[in-house]
Regions:
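Conserved active-site segments centered on acidic
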Residues: 1-85
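Phosphate-binding/catalytic loops
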Residues: 86-88, 94-104
């Protein structure tokens, strides 16, 4: 089983979109049992009192237009242990790469 985590700054737009689009692609190919896919943030800006904000409404709307459900997703921050837990950590941009290095 391949474990993949997409990472962006706040985990409310880009990385959740990548997570749910990839999950949809896997489902359409019948490969759900071969992958674990999730997403996280490098910051805590979208996490308040331990509770992450949901997917940003315009991002959720785009997913909904493609019949991709992201209900229940809330922002979470990447942890040092994720480097060992996941096979692939996929940052959305070069700033995410830099910020991810703080967790090593």
């Amino acid at each position: 089983m391949t474990k993949i985590m997409f990472v962006c700054h706040g985990n409310i737009c880009r990385s959740p979109m990548a997570e749910f689009i990839f999950k949809d692609m896997i489902k359409k190919k019948g490969l759900e049992g071969d992958f674990v896919v999730t997403s996280s943030a490098t910051s805590t800006e979208e996490i308040w009192n331990g509770v992450g904000n949901p997917v940003y409404p315009p991002a959720k709307e785009i997913l909904n237009l493609h019949n991709i459900d992201c209900n229940g997703k809330r922002a979470v921050q990447i942890k040092k242990s994720d480097y060992e837990k996941y096979d692939l950590l996929i940052p959305m941009d070069s700033n995410n790469v830099r910020n991810m290095s703080r967790f090593l």
